[in-house]
Each structure stands twice: as structure tokens, then as C-alpha cells.
């Protein structure tokens, strides 16, 4: 048996248990047909950042601590006069996780952060996009234990997009359920 000390626990479980289970359940003929996680994108939209520049920097730091990877600022693509928004203004923060960091983040999200949500009954099963990807919103970044409650500028939410190679929502839901995602019944 090989040493899996540096490979994330979820990745090991995916290779050893989930792939054979899904090949049997869906009748795939090759391992390459089995859906897998491609990336996880975390993003925060900060419309208030136009007035308060410190908020954007604090959000970059928060997302960096949550993900373990440096976050980048996103810019407005179009000007919208009603929102006093100009093209090129920095109005959001995002980070894309792949490989080991992706599996480690998903493990922390499922086993540490989501159980800390007040009155948590599972994530919504209605977050699939029809092409095997799942999106969910988190209302407070303080559910992650890495965030120090005393040092945060403002409580804000973030979007979590899980991109898979699944062709259908059913395949993606099965994959995420086997990885431990607690869907509402």
C-alpha cells in the first residue's frame, strides 16, 4: 500500500471508493467517464467597495485566509449609471481552487464550516445549472474557523461554485453526495 500522507483525504476516497461505485451505478466502461471535480471558484461581490476601499482589501485578506490562496480583485465590465458604477472599477474578489487545495477546501466546507451554520438542515438541491455544476451561497464568512471574528471589517457572504466534469445534474449530485455534501431532502 502506498503512503497517502500528502494526498487529501477526499481525493483518496474519490479514487478508492467513489470511482468504482459510480462506474457500477452509472455503467461507465472506463474510469475516464466518471465525473470528477475540476475546480471550485469562491467569489464575493462588493458593491459597497466603491465608497469604501478598505472593504475590498479586507475581503481579499478574508478570502485568502479561507482558501489558502491569494485572491484577486475583479473589475466591472460595464458602466451602470444608476449604481454609480464605472467600467474598470474594482467591485469584487475571487479565487479559483484546483487540485489539492480544492479537495482540502471542500473537506473543510463540508465537515467544519457548514455544521457551524445556524439552523443548518442541508444545502439546497436546486443549485445545479443543468450541466453538472453546483453553486451555493454562504451568508456569513465567519462560519470558517480561520476567520477571526474580532478582525473582520464587515460580515459578508460569498458564492461557492463547484465545477465538475459531469454531463448531467444527476451525475454531479451523486458525485457530491458521495463526497459528503449534505443535500436537503
Curated annotation (Swiss-Prot):
SUPFAM superfamilies reported in the protein's UniProt record: RL5-like
Presence of keyword Ribosomal protein: yes
Matches recorded under Pfam families: Ribosomal_L5 (PF00281), Ribosomal_L5_C (PF00673)
BP GO terms, sorted: translation
Residue pairs linked by disulfide bridges in the UniProt entry: none
Family the UniProt entry places it in: Belongs to the universal ribosomal protein uL5 family.
The protein, known as: Large ribosomal subunit protein uL5
Amino acid at each position: 500500500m502506498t503512503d497517502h500522507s500528502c494526498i487529501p483525504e477526499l481525493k483518496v476516497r474519490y479514487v478508492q471508493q467513489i470511482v468504482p461505485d459510480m462506474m457500477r451505478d452509472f455503467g461507465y466502461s472506463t474510469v475516464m467517464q466518471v465525473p470528477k471535480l475540476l475546480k471550485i471558484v469562491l467569489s464575493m461581490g462588493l458593491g459597497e467597495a466603491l465608497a469604501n476601499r478598505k472593504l475590498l482589501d479586507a475581503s481579499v485578506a478574508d478570502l485568502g485566509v479561507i482558501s489558502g490562496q491569494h485572491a484577486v480583485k475583479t473589475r466591472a465590465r460595464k458602466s451602470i449609471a444608476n449604481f454609480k458604477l464605472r467600467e474598470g472599477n474594482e467591485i469584487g474578489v475571487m479565487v479559483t481552487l484546483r487540485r489539492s487545495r480544492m479537495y482540502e477546501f471542500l473537506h473543510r466546507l463540508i465537515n467544519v464550516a457548514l455544521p457551524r451554520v445556524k439552523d443548518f438542515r442541508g444545502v439546497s438541491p436546486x443549485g445545479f445549472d443543468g450541466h453538472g455544476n453546483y453553486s451555493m451561497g454562504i451568508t456569513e464568512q465567519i462560519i470558517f474557523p480561520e476567520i477571526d471574528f474580532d478582525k473582520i471589517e464587515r460580515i459578508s457572504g460569498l458564492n461557492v461554485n463547484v465545477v465538475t466534469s459531469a454531463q448531467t445534474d444527476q451525475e454531479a449530485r451523486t458525485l457530491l453526495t458521495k463526497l459528503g455534501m449534505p443535500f436537503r431532502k
